[in-house]
């Protein structure tokens, strides 16, 4: 249990997807203009990461890894070179299924998140989480916690940036830095702040 808690805290603060690895920066910068939009996208990312990381873990361990097909009588087969394209396929399929389920059973939630769901398919933080999970050789339970933690960390970062950007609208920012200029500086300072968590022994 302590190991799972360590993975969660580490993925939220120490190894934050947005502020430590700089993954998902396209949507991170584009959707962080308003807090409401940032919260919507953050929730969608948490849900998608919570589902896709464990599913990709199962697929890697039972289909792609070296010797994973021993249950089918194919012991010497190693399909790990297909990992990247398979993870992308799983992410796209799960996002599409999620979109259809929300549209049919939760139309109000679909109306709120509908714009963000297609953006998640091409969010590199989702793919990055799957690749990091394989690289770190997480078990299924660890991959679930890592998926949730990575999503929460990314959502926390985008909501924090959106709050700062809303305050910056009323600040006297030099003309040359308005827009993305001051946003890049802000993200850099946020990232420096999150680096302080690197000293935590987990």
Curated annotation (Swiss-Prot):
What is this enzyme's catalytic activity, as reactions?
a ubiquinone + n Na(+)(in) + NADH + H(+) = a ubiquinol + n Na(+)(out) + NAD(+)
Which keywords label this protein? Answer: Cell inner membrane, Cell membrane, Ion transport, Membrane, NAD, Sodium, Sodium transport, Translocase, Transmembrane, Transmembrane helix, Transport, Ubiquinone
Enzyme nomenclature, EC number: 7.2.1.1
Q: State where the protein is found.
A: Cell inner membrane
- One Pfam family from the record: Rnf-Nqr
Any one GO CC term of this protein is: Gram-negative-bacterium-type cell wall
An annotated GO BP: sodium ion transport
Q: What membrane topology does the UniProt entry give?
A: Multi-pass membrane protein
Coiled-coil intervals in this record? none
Q: Which InterPro entries match?
A: NqrDE/RnfAE, NqrDE/RnfAE_oxidrdctase, NqrE
Q: Where are the transmembrane segments?
A: 11-31, 35-55, 81-101, 114-134, 144-164, 182-202
GO molecular function, a single term: oxidoreductase activity, acting on NAD(P)H, quinone or similar compound as acceptor
Oligomeric form and interacting partners: Composed of six subunits; NqrA, NqrB, NqrC, NqrD, NqrE and NqrF.
PANTHER family reported in the protein's UniProt record: INTEGRAL MEMBRANE PROTEIN OF SOXR-REDUCING COMPLEX, NA(+)-TRANSLOCATING NADH-QUINONE REDUCTASE SUBUNIT E
Q: What does this protein do?
A: NQR complex catalyzes the reduction of ubiquinone-1 to ubiquinol by two successive reactions, coupled with the transport of Na(+) ions from the cytoplasm to the periplasm. NqrA to NqrE are probably involved in the second step, the conversion of ubisemiquinone to ubiquinol.
Of which family is this protein a member? Belongs to the NqrDE/RnfAE family.
Q: What is the protein's given name?
A: Na(+)-translocating NADH-quinone reductase subunit E
Species this chain originates from: Saccharophagus degradans (strain 2-40 / ATCC 43961 / DSM 17024)
């Amino acid at each position: 249990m302590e190991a799972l808690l360590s993975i969660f805290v580490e993925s939220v603060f120490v190894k934050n997807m947005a502020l430590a690895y700089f993954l998902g920066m396209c949507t991170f910068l584009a959707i962080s203009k308003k807090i409401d939009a940032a919260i919507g996208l953050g929730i969608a990312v948490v849900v998608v990461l919570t589902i896709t990381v464990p599913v990709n873990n199962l697929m890697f361990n039972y289909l792609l890894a070296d010797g994973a097909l021993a249950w089918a009588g194919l012991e010497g087969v190693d399909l790990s070179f297909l990992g990247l394209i398979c993870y992308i396929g799983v992410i796209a399929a799960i996002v599409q299924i999620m979109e259809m389920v929300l549209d049919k059973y939760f139309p109000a939630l679909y109306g709120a998140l509908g714009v963000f769901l297609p953006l998640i398919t091409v969010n590199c933080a989702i793919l990055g989480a799957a690749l990091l999970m394989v690289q770190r050789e997480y078990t299924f339970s660890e991959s679930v916690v890592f998926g949730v933690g990575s999503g929460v960390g990314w959502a926390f970062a985008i909501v924090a940036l959106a709050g700062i950007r809303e305050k910056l609208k009323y600040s006297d920012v030099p003309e040359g830095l308005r827009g993305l200029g001051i946003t890049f500086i802000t993200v850099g300072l946020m990232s420096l702040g999150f680096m302080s968590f690197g000293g935590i022994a987990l």
